Structures are given as C-alpha cells and as structure tokens.
Amino acid sequence: MPDVTISIWTAVVGFFLSFLAYFFKKWCPSLYVYILTAILGIGWIVYVFLDQGFIKTVPIFFIFVFSFFSSPVPERSKVQLQEIIDQLKEQGAREIVLSKNKERLLVDFLFSGLFIVIAVLYFLFGPDSPITLILLYSFVSLVVGLTKRVELFRALRLFYAEHEEVLYAVSLFETKKYPLEELSEVSVQTRPDVLQLFQLFSLFSPNMDYTTSMGKTWKLSFSGEKVYFTPDPSESMAFLLKEEIHKMEEVEVKPFYHQNNWKRLLGKWYFAATVKGVGAYAALITLFTLMGIGPIVTTIVMVLFWIFNLWISDRVLKIALDMKKIDDPDLLPIIEKVFSRAGLSHVDIYVTESAEYNGFAIGANIGRSLVALTSETLKLPHEAIEGILAHEAIHVKKRDVLMGQLLRFLLIGLVLAGVFLFYKAFQNWLEHAQIFVFLSLWLLIFLLPAFQSLFTQWMEVRADHLGATLLDGGNAQMANSLTILCEYQDRALEKSAGYYVTFEKEQEANKKDKKISSLERDSWFFRFLEFQFMSHPPMYWRVHSLQTTETGWSIGKIKLWWCSRFRESLPN
C-alpha cells in the first residue's frame, strides 16, 4: 500500500491542477491548458515513482485521476452564468427568492464531519491496508460534496418562466430546467428532512437538494427526479398547483435531533458506516491498533462483526431507507397470491421512496427477509408489479442475498489466502520481480468481479424463470413485466438527462446522439462488459430468453445462459 501522506498529497495535487486548468482556460486555449496540467501531473507521478516504487505508484495514479476529475470545479464561468441569468430575465422569467440560513450548511458539515474524523483518525493511527484507499475515496467524495453545497448555498438562483411553464435552477456547477408538465406531485414540509437528503444516508441516486435553510421546504416530483428547495416565505408558489395549492396540508418534519428521530438517525448512520461505507470497520481497527491488539484477533473480530451486520441487515435497511409496509388494497391480493405460491406467506413487502424503478430482496435468510419496491415502481401496471414481486420472491426462497454475500466473502478469502501462500513460497524471487507482481495483482482485481458476476447472474436468470412459474401468464408475463420496467426506467432517465441546460453547440451535439434502449442489443464491447462483469445479464437477453423458452427452470436453460454469456461477448 502507498504511504498515506503521499496519497493525501496526491489528492491535493489533483484538486489543485483541476482548479489551475479551470482558471487558465479563461485566458489560454484549452489544448495548451490540458498539456500544461498533464505535464505537471506526470511530473508528480514520476516523483512518486522514484520515491515509492512501481507497485505503490499504481494506486497513487488512480487517486490522482479520481481527484482531478471529481474536484468541485464549476461547469461554467461566472460570465457564462450571468449570461444565462440575463437571458432568463429578458424572457420575462420571475426570480424566486430563496430563504437562506447557515444552519442548513452546518448540518451537512456536522454529518460529513463525523465520517471525515473517522477517516483522519485511521490515516493517523490505523494500519496500512486496502481500507486506507476506500477511506481516501470517501474522504475526497465528502470534501467535494461539501464544497459544492457551499457554492450552491452561495450562488443558487431559481427562476420561473411563465410563458414556458418551466422552473430553472441556476448555479455554477449546473443549470437545470424542469417543465411543469413533467410535475407529478407536490408537497410541502415544515423543514427539510436532512436524514433523507444527506448523500450517505441514501441507497439510491441522491435527490436534487436545493435547500438553503431549515424552513418550509417544497418537494417537487418530476419524472426521474425529485427536487427540494426552500423559497422565502414571501414568495407565492401558486403557479405549481394553481387552485389546488390552497388545499395542501404541510407535512410535519421533526428536527433530526428530535427524540422521535433518534432511531432513524442511528439506523441511517449505521447504514452509512457499515453498508455504504467502511467507517465502522475503520473505527474498530483504529481502536484495536491503539490498544495494541494483534492482527489475528482484529481479523477475527472484523469477520464476526461482518456476520453480525449481515444478520441484522434487514432491520438496518428498513430503518435507513424509511420503509413502510405496502397497504394498497389493490396490491395486497397480488402480493398474497405470489408469495403464497412461493411458500413465503410470512415475508413482508415494503415501499421506499425513490425516483428510480427498482425492487430488491433483503435479509440473511427466509425468516428474516423482506422485499422492497420503490415508490416509482408502484406506479407501474399491476401485471408488471406482479412479475417483479415473483422475481424477488425467488431470491428470498433461494436465500440469494445470503449466498451472494458468502460467495463474495469466500472469493475474497481465497484470493487473499492464495496471495499470502504464494508470497511465502516465493518471497525472495518476488522482491526482485515487481512487474510480475503488479501484473498478477491487476489480473486478480480484473478476475474477481468476473467470478462474482458468474454467480450473481446465474441467480438473476434463475429468479426470472422460476419467478415465471408463480405467474398466471408464465414466461410471457415475466418478459412483459421486465419490458415495462425497462421502458419506464429508460423514459425517466431520458427525462432526467433532458433537464440539464447546455449551450447551443452542446445542444446540437445532444440532438445527434442516438437514444439507446435497455431492450436493444448493444455493441459487442458493452455486451462483453455486462455479461462478464455486471450482476445482471443485459435486459434484452433476459427478455429474449423468457420469450423463446418454456416456463420453468432446467439444465437446458443453464446451458443457454452459459453459452450466451460467451457468445454474446464476442464481436458480431
């Protein structure tokens, strides 16, 4: 592993060069600026190579690339931003004054600060391990997120263009336009629900958080995106719902520190520290290191802690994702029918709020499992929801969540054991063969997700075909369910991408871009990536395999998937 100090300085250099490029582009052609930053970046990498050696320089290089491209550099200059604002005003757009209070920023700094402190303590006192790189990635991401939040707080402007019926959100980092014709739901909260908005407390893509105070918050649900903002109390928002606006009731949101939110706060923090990140593991390792506890005991405790987290994963995620039991009287008979046929009448079905279309199973075994659907998924036709539920029911019945975690643990354990034994056997030779060691390590990194994909895709294909046996329509209904799911998701993604405001040249290029459907057979390279490295086979193949085979699961279908996995990964 590379030196922690060098790793942090590399991230700083990446940030610095990114900002340097941003400022120099105001006076110099972009090509010259990129050449200059490339020379400076290569110079830093060469310095690290001479100081750290070949193997340690490789992760340093990726740290540099990540920090350079993820740095919070504005998308536009202030001049370009002002041009957009002036153009909106010339067109008669009305500015919506925002309520601003630094308390909102302090909450983000408080939440992020807890995880940043854990990372810093590990950097200072923790042992040298791969966790260092994971924490550094999280550290950089949090710093970038905080920087963007500060800039958003300082410079965000909202406009409503009445002639277009479009809401504009204008900032240095991005400018978006939201047509009110895509607005499906409006609600008002007494304050922003920061436990829902903070980036580490969400499993899905983060919401568009434009909140700049702890006051009354408007939540707008557009196709593919949910937007939150805090207008000044003096602003009239009647344009959003016309006559219905006066009939709306405010949704009361308690402060995050309120007694009623303690369970949510703890659950979301635990989720961020154990599921979405490694903060809890890093904190324990740092504590054990300071106490002088040896690596063997530390490793045993970490494994037991991982097993414990797997065991309580259903309860943690239920709290962290604010799940609620589905009580729709139209859906309850469908749920009862599907899960009774699967022999799983005791499994609870929940809904979690998200703009994505998705469903997933949670839990270490049948007795502690649940199935969750996103709020957008519940808007699909009932026949499609039935197919999604049948797919997830098979995951629960076959204990796929538990098996997937155990297989991942087993694969990583075998790789580490193999590396350790190989190093012990050829230690003297390996110390003089750094190129071989480097290539071998990257081959293992390359093959690990491929092996994992092999098992997870088999589980997904099995869930499709066995799930079809729970449906009245069999394979045809399951294929139709997946098709509808993809069509809705693709449409939402297209709408979300269309909210970005670009300059005329960029708009011309975007118009020429071909829209790619998830149901269409892609080029061989992307098919190769999906079949060999992703957890799910490509959707076009899943639908096709259902449409061209009989309902049921057999050795023949395993052979079909196995052959397609390699045949479809080859050039046409």
Indicate where each model-derived feature is located.
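Juxtamembrane "helix exit" motif at the C-terminal ends of alpha-helical transmembrane segments
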Residues: 44-47, 116-132, 280-297, 412-431
